[in-house]
Amino acid sequence: MKVRNSLRSLKSRHRDCQVVRRKGRIYVINKTNPRFKARQG
């Protein structure tokens, strides 16, 4: 999982990427291709 300042560019890397808030943190998850996972902050 990558840790990034901005998730906007990561969201556009793959069409299945979703931005999700969990426990106050913002994550990018991808069910079909898990290597695109990322977290902000």
Curated annotation (Swiss-Prot):
InterPro entries: Ribosomal_bL36, Ribosomal_bL36_sp, Ribosomal_L36_bact
One Gene Ontology term of the molecular function aspect: structural constituent of ribosome
GO-annotated biological processes: translation
Keyword set, alphabetical order: Ribonucleoprotein, Ribosomal protein
Keyword NAD in annotation: no
UniProt keyword annotation of Ribonucleoprotein present: yes
Name of the molecule in the record: Large ribosomal subunit protein bL36
Species name: Paracoccus denitrificans (strain Pd 1222)
Source species taxonomy: Bacteria, Pseudomonadati, Pseudomonadota, Alphaproteobacteria, Rhodobacterales
